[in-house]
Amino acid sequence: MGAGQSICFPPISGPHHIGCTDVMEGHSLEGSLFRLFYPCEASETCEQPLWIPRYEYCVGLADYLQYNKRWVGLLFNVGIGSCRLPVSWNGPFKTKESGYPLIILSHGLGGFRVSYSAFCMELASRGFVVAAIEHRDQSAAATYFCKQTSQESSPTESLEEEWIPFRRIKEGEKEFHVRNPQVHQRAKECVRVLQILQDASAGKPVINVFPGGLDLMTLKGSIDMSRVAVMGHSFGGATAILALTQEAQFRCAIALDAWMFPLEHDFYPKARGPVFFINVEKFQTVESVNLMKKICAQHEQSRIVTVLGAVHRSQTDFAFVTGNMIGKLFSSGTRGTLDPYEGQEVMVRAMLAFLQKHLDLKEDYDQWNSFIEGIGPSLIQGAPHYLSSL
């Protein structure tokens, strides 16, 4: 993997083989880009996709972390640019008459559509279809869309990439005035992807800008649109909470270490539930926990748990990057005292129990119902005591 760097994803525990494809819908900023993880048919020969799709994302990641874009972007590309996901790229979709439940996933600040592949793969192996969005509000480390430059050429010949850089807060700017419009755009993008997949499940044609990908018509009748959840990490956690309120088709939300700051105070009386807040030990503040408690007070099925020994980036794929050089570039914020593989297992089990309960799934995930109450390995209910004062 170049310079001894690699990423070692947690082993998959579900019964399904996993397929993966990228979908870009539309030729403008208002379109959508997401990576779809899904149960697929077994295949003797399958291509495994790159974890980091392109070099531009390595450069964007370096820029987001405020390193030299040229040199550190190159280092990231050498260190992790050749790592691949253990899934079948554009693998044949495994149809299901009763349909799979759907999860829309929103990334955090500086993330992009592959930043939570470990969670996505595990959930897909358990029989979920997961759409990991790449937001176009300038909160992604890098993203792009393909615009048509000529009406006379064929659609693929006339496409030109337009890259959208990460938006940093400028001197003198109020951060809330930047982040609040972003979180609202992000929620709309979640709803847009939901609509695209609803069309695909209904057998309506969805044109994917990327050539040679999965035929989305194969999804027809195989997504259960009555069992849909929205999920996100950090900025994506706030996005999931807002999207749940704005779109009734979302039945519940999972907020991983949610960054509550971008949500306006007027939002809270309107907030819907249930929301499952899965926090880590060292990120939240008393103020943010109190905002979570406001939502929980309005919706008795909402819960807050904390994963002890975990840090903010423990909930991203970067927790599984090995090698000292790349690890140091991500700083001590990449790993906590809790083994990242143990943390992943605990969080996934808590998610599955919550999803079974609120999507009415007929699985055995209720064996982990105690995790929803903060009773389980490395879990506590609510927040650590030093954040618990109202």
Curated annotation (Swiss-Prot):
It holds the Pfam family PAF-AH_p_II. Keywords: Cytoplasm, Endoplasmic reticulum, Hydrolase, Lipid degradation, Lipid metabolism, Lipoprotein, Membrane, Microsome, Mitochondrion, Myristate, Transferase. It catalyses: a 1-O-alkyl-2-acetyl-sn-glycero-3-phosphocholine + H2O = a 1-O-alkyl-sn-glycero-3-phosphocholine + acetate + H(+); a 1-O-alkyl-2-acyl-sn-glycero-3-phosphocholine + H2O = a 1-O-alkyl-sn-glycero-3-phosphocholine + a fatty acid + H(+); 1-O-hexadecyl-2-acetyl-sn-glycero-3-phosphocholine + H2O = 1-O-hexadecyl-sn-glycero-3-phosphocholine + acetate + H(+); 1-O-hexadecyl-2-acetyl-sn-glycero-3-phosphocholine + a 1-O-(1Z-alkenyl)-sn-glycero-3-phosphoethanolamine = 1-O-(1Z-alkenyl)-2-acetyl-sn-glycero-3-phosphoethanolamine + 1-O-hexadecyl-sn-glycero-3-phosphocholine. One of its GO terms (biological process) is negative regulation of apoptotic process. Its EC number is 3.1.1.47, 2.3.1.149. It is found in: Microsome membrane; Mitochondrion membrane; Cytoplasm; Endoplasmic reticulum membrane. Expressed in kidney. Its main location: membrane. One of its GO terms (molecular function) is platelet-activating factor acetyltransferase activity. It is a lipid-anchor. The active site is at 234 (nucleophile), 257 (charge relay system), 312 (charge relay system). A lipid is attached at residue 2 (N-myristoyl glycine). GO terms for cellular component: cytoplasm; endoplasmic reticulum membrane; mitochondrial membrane. Belongs to the serine esterase family. Catalyzes the hydrolyze of the acetyl group at the sn-2 position of platelet-activating factor (PAF) and its analogs, leading to their inactivation. Hydrolyzes propionyl and butyroyl moieties approximately half as effectively as PAF. Also catalyzes transacetylation of the acetyl group from platelet-activating factor (PAF) to lysoplasmalogen and to sphingosine, producing plasmalogen analogs of PAF and N-acetylsphingosine (C2-ceramide) respectively. Has a marked selectivity for phospholipids with short acyl chains at the sn-2 position. Monomer. This is Platelet-activating factor acetylhydrolase 2, cytoplasmic. It comes from Rattus norvegicus (Rat).
